[in-house]
UniProtKB/Swiss-Prot annotation:
Pfam families: Ribosomal_L23 (PF00276). Part of the 50S ribosomal subunit. Contacts protein L29, and trigger factor when it is bound to the ribosome. InterPro entries: Nucleotide-bd_a/b_plait_sf, Ribosomal_uL23-like, Ribosomal_uL23/eL15/eS24_sf. GO terms for cellular component: ribonucleoprotein complex; ribosome. Belongs to the universal ribosomal protein uL23 family. GO terms for biological process: translation. This is Large ribosomal subunit protein uL23. NCBIfam families: PRK05738.1-3 (NF004359), PRK05738.2-4 (NF004363). GO terms for molecular function: rRNA binding; structural constituent of ribosome. One of the early assembly proteins it binds 23S rRNA. One of the proteins that surrounds the polypeptide exit tunnel on the outside of the ribosome. Forms the main docking site for trigger factor binding to the ribosome. The keyword Transmembrane does not apply. Keywords: Ribonucleoprotein, Ribosomal protein, RNA-binding, rRNA-binding.
């Protein structure tokens, strides 16, 4: 199944929009150190195949796997008014051994 999907062509404009932002937190840094995985905030309707293709296109690295999860937005109050934060879709992109992706901007 993956061999068929890896040959599928994606729209390059769409791939440039799939990755919204990298997530830099304590947990994301710990996961990056242990498992060579990078965490991204992605579009709600992005698929694993699109995320993999977008990372390979933008950063020129080989991707081993992609794990995706949806985070429900929290309900928040400000005085009497009740609001809700947006839902977030998060992707953990595991790179193949020997590959490195530096999002910090500092050169090694």
């Amino acid at each position: 199944m993956s061999a068929v999907n890896s040959k599928t062509k994606f729209d390059e404009g769409r791939l440039m929009q799939v990755l919204v932002a990298p997530i830099v937190s304590e947990k994301a840094t710990m996961i990056a150190d242990k498992t060579n995985a990078v965490t991204f905030k992605v579009l709600q309707d992005a698929t694993k195949f699109e995320i993999k293709a977008a990372v390979q296109l933008m950063f020129k690295v080989d991707v081993q796997s992609v794990a995706v999860l949806n985070i429900k937005g929290k309900t928040k109050r400000f005085g009497k008014s009740v609001g809700r934060r947006d839902n977030i879709r998060k992707a953990y992109v595991t790179l193949k051994p020997g590959q490195e992706l530096n999002l910090g901007g500092e050169s090694a």
